[in-house]
Amino acid sequence: MPSAGQRKPGSLLALQALQKWLLRGGVGAMLARQVVAALLLWLSCCVSALWRYYINSQDYSIFSTRSSIKLEYEGNSFVSWKIPESCKVENTTSPKTTLHCKRAGIHTIKPIAGNQEVERHLTVDNSYICYLWYFTVVDVYYNLSQIVTIWVYDPESASTEELIWTAKKPSLSSRVLTKQMNTLGQRPFIFTVEKRLTYHPGPLTSEGTWVIHLPMSSDDIAKVIRGNKVAFQDCFIANLYFMLTYPMTIISEPPGYEPLTVPPGSPLMLSWDTCISTFALLATDQETFQTNDSFQTWTRVRAPPGILSDAQRHSLRDVIIFDQGTLFLVDGTVYLRTEDEFTKLDESRGISETGILGFSKRRWCQIRYLYKLASKKSILIAWSKTTVYAGYATFRFVTLTDTAKLKDFLKLPQTDTLEVMSVEYLWHPLEAAVLLSHCSVCTTNTRNIRIVIYSAIFQTWTLQDFELQLPKEAILEFRFLYSAMPDIIMWDQHHVYYSYKNFTVVGTISTPSGETNLSSLSQGSKIHQVLTDRIGNVVVKMENNVMFYIKADITEAVILHTWVNTTAKTVVLFDKSFEVCILYYNENLDEKYQLQTQPYPLILELQSINKDLGDWCPYLAFQHNIHSQFYHMDKGESLTIWSQIVYPENRGLYIVVEHYGSSVMTWTQNLEYEIASGFCTKTMITRFFQTTNYELVDNYYQLQKENTGLMLLQFRPSEFSRTCLTAKPVFEIDVGCDSSKYIMVRGFNKSRCQRRDFSYVIDKELLRESLSDNLKVRYDVAKYGCPLTLELGQMFQPIVELYDENGFIKIVDANFILWEIHGRNDYTFNSTMEQNGCINEAQTWDSMIEENPDIPLDDVWGPQNYRPCFSYAIGKPGDLGQPYEILNYSNKNHIKWPMTYAGMYVYRLKILDPNYSFCNLTTIFAIESLGMIPRSSVYLVAALIFVLMLTFISILVLSYFWYLKIYRQFIIEPLHKRPAKQKKN
């Protein structure tokens, strides 16, 4: 590949010294920066080559003294490699060779060539983690499960297929290694990051693999393969983080479809799914490609003939990919491509047919929150110069606002010019920011940039304390960083701007030399991509593949060592293990080789850069127990966060807690401080909770609404730098009803009932309401489950259990009530109000129905109007000998049924305690009570006996006469009959 220019860190330090000398000599800051920029440009033009390094594994976390480091020089002036004595190279005069460093430490590697080349400082660890996990996945559709086959491999002896992740079974060396690890007690398991579930394998197969079966999942996709702490030849296995979701469908294009591309000469355009970065789409000036495995395989994306003209097909301006379909922006018009259609979106879908400038979607995956009422949440935002649209899962849009309304909100004259530049979602899942361009007299060459934030919770717009002046022709884009606070990175073609700490720290990103124009440091190239991750890394890629690095909350950018030449067509993206990689596109190669991915060792490159810059992290360790991005908090619950920072003595660091969103919680903090061996350790325990009491309030539902919401929090050290590798933990606490929670009565199950539906009749005298006829009821087994059959006189106390999507949580210890859903009233309770400790008369169904006439029985009594009977100040005196109709786990109150007859009862149970849950927790169960056989009527018995006796006597009389007839016919008459006379012959 053609080569690119590269300045070296030694030159950078010299230029920094030169700039300081110029400033001390009285030269203006602007002139000093111009001199330095000119020298940087000259250096980049004069250096004509680059070099890279690789290891056998795609995972650079095992970069150690055991690794075979492949060195590769790209250029024509190579002479030899300059390496330290602690390392050995196979061939010092070969541009491609292998390096081995047997001693841990920072090793300076440099090629000797015709021009002065850049040197890298490679950090080689003496790690005991040498082996890696390998896995394959088979999707099983009939039961929606996935079969994961796992084995161990050593990158230094693995097969080529294993190294490029195309192997279907282990190689011989991997099979032997896996069996040896199994003998030593190794057993892998898959751990899901979000729901924290664990899946274990069966025994090792004859092929030397473990097999794990797990269900397909769309909301728990981040997984880790872990194992026991087992070593072989002093080497352990590294944990493998990866994404595994339900199969993402790739739409194949029928023959005859036509290419859909970006304009000729445009840089590559990339879009990936918010939660599944392996599901992506790449648009080039030749073709558009789609993948579901980070471009290990791909298909072409084309347009059906007759919909777009030739010019339109080569005018793709923006693209956004979803599982439901893909949206293309062509000449201001949005087109939707799904499995069934390729169609233009217009006013019938709620969006303008022309004039659309762009669209965006959420950049951060917040599955657990977004899956709550997902159909009611927007999935993308589109905009024109004057209008902002919100798009939903059906790809229908609604208008959020327009510039006329925004002018009124901002109190701007209608004669001012206000245009929408861009729109982005915040890290807060229900907020979006609109970037506005404003000018009163637009004849000047500058314009003011404003930001307003829309809250979907309150449906309000808020103007932020942010203002930026840019040239009129500047095209501005922006992203919200992975932060609880609305931290922003913005960029035009040449500069990067920042806004940190809720718009209180605003400015322009500069390099250590003070330069803010990144194009001047990259041969005049424009900004192509800005990639952000959850750790706070921000990579700015220029069109000529020069890359800069910015750390979140840091206002300085550093230029990274050149990795790719200036003419290669590339984009940066994340692979299935959430690591940064580079995707190359070369239209001149065979079709199956046109796209190639290459891991990029970002951390190693940063360590090499920081060696010359002298940057260091102010703390040694920052730890916490925040293992999830999403926490749910119900009434009576609390969340305890443990965090700890270790730093050199006298630095005075501390842990900062920042929050954003609804202020619906209170928290307390407990600090512990320790000094030992010149280091300070601060431990902070933070407890989040609510103090609101919902009992005895008149506005129960309104009070609940005021105390529910989403609160975003982050814990961070008070000081940090570019070299701090630990990320600030960011999480959200959703206070409110958890839709996955439900209750069940112990012993009842709807799914394993073998009975069939049946009908029964309830006597009208047994109903709460008066009816003219008996009530016939159809018992639906699927709805009510199997009824529990109770013997004569047996009482029953329901034990209520609380569950969520992961199974049983606990036994409910709160008060609850129940009622028969068909209106039966022929049951009671075994304890009285007095026996349960009541001072005043307790609430009953009869009293609540009397207080709330014309209200459905389900709403007559509940947590909204519950009043306890254990205080003189609440309620009124009355008959305490009445049955107590409130139950709980500890009061031993039981349900009683009449013993004189049998009956079928279908009950609905409701949690009554107003301080137990934001959810309306109810369940249904059925009881079949077996009563005594009722005594028959005396007259009926006498009549029955009379009939039986009459029948018996009648039979006797008839049998007597029948016997006489037979006796006379066959005995008497033959004896008295004269013999017949014989005839004579």
From Swiss-Prot:
Residues 1-35 form the signal peptide. GO terms for cellular component: CatSper complex; sperm principal piece. Keywords: Cell membrane, Cell projection, Cilium, Disulfide bond, Flagellum, Glycoprotein, Membrane, Signal, Transmembrane, Transmembrane helix. Residues 959-985 are cytoplasmic. It is a single-pass type I membrane protein. It is found in: Cell projection, Cilium, Flagellum membrane. The chain crosses the membrane at residues 938-958. Residues 36-937 are extracellular. Testis-specific. Disulfide bonds join C87-C101, C130-C235, C275-C365, C439-C442, C617-C724, C737-C919, C753-C786, C838-C869. Glycans are attached at N91, N143, N292, N502, N517, N565, N749, N830, N888, N915, N920. Auxiliary component of the CatSper complex, a complex involved in sperm cell hyperactivation. Sperm cell hyperactivation is needed for sperm motility which is essential late in the preparation of sperm for fertilization. Belongs to the CATSPERD family. Component of the CatSper complex or CatSpermasome composed of the core pore-forming members CATSPER1, CATSPER2, CATSPER3 and CATSPER4 as well as auxiliary members CATSPERB, CATSPERG2, CATSPERD, CATSPERE, CATSPERZ, C2CD6/CATSPERT, SLCO6C1, TMEM249, TMEM262 and EFCAB9. HSPA1 may be an additional auxiliary complex member. The core complex members CATSPER1, CATSPER2, CATSPER3 and CATSPER4 form a heterotetrameric channel. This is Cation channel sperm-associated auxiliary subunit epsilon. The lineage of its organism: Eukaryota, Metazoa, Chordata, Craniata, Vertebrata. The gene is Catspere.
